[in-house]
């Protein structure tokens, strides 16, 4: 069975249990979905009927006799647990050199280089929450024009500045310069992120003018193959940034998860031939890193509420794929991602019923299935499930 269109949703960080090598990453016992849903008193009827509860025992999501989707869990072959590594593997790359994280801030030589190339002083230079760092340094930045440089548990370098002090175009230009400089392999920083904010001391707000400057993928992805074959590749949310535009034919920005679902529904109702690819980042950015279990739980419920609308809007020859890129268990110590299996659900109105697919294959099985469906070159690793979808 083949499909005219494939819609791929990455529920960012919604892992489904510790990976076989979780202990090496300090993540033994992690289980984002299970731990997030413990104590939840609502229901998730759409994820349940697709078969999410058939993948692993979960609170409130029951196992069903006739799941509507094909389902399994996938493990990551690459040596990281960050967003870029997970997404790049989904599209067929095996990342064997991990991106670097900077738990003690960036090296002095890099800070000096940023100051010299921008003519502005760097302050902060430490891991921090984006909202906390502007609360701490925002007023200082307004007075001095310094750059608030910070990182997180991810391999990112973020630069925050007030929009009225450093205009957006200048902030973007600064980030482009830093991106170019940090392409040196000794840094291995996945993304440089512009983080503009507005407001007054005590009431700062980050704006939607964030921009990510990623490294280009380390090889060709399934998205490149689709683009070369004349197919549409519609990137929704931060997908375009994650792949640095490689293989993307159209990019649609989003404000949050619900706006992402709105934009996906618009795409589903439009005419195109190929892949739509949505990342829902709020699970990770707003709730996982902040260890906000209740917020995470409510975000999953909000997604399930919208999922019913999406299922109804799908065309007969559409395939919907729902997965994740890593875990971020809000009950674990620290603020970092967790090394976990990710769920895989594949649904089409053409299916009489779903069933379990072979488990323990890699994230690249998703890209392989998409490539197989559209008749383009398959990635070097990853198992296509296309023949099993009937």
From Swiss-Prot:
Gene3D superfamilies: Alkaline Phosphatase, subunit A (3.40.720.10), Phosphopentomutase (3.30.70.1250). SUPFAM superfamilies: Alkaline phosphatase-like, DeoB insert domain-like. It is found in: Cytoplasm. One of its GO terms (molecular function) is phosphopentomutase activity. Mn(2+) 2 binds at residues 284, 289, 337. GO terms for biological process: 2-deoxyribose 1-phosphate catabolic process; 5-phosphoribose 1-diphosphate biosynthetic process; metabolic compound salvage; nucleotide metabolic process. The keyword Isomerase applies. This is Phosphopentomutase. It comes from Macrococcus caseolyticus (strain JCSC5402) (Macrococcoides caseolyticum). The lineage of its organism: Bacteria, Bacillati, Bacillota, Bacilli, Bacillales. The gene is deoB.
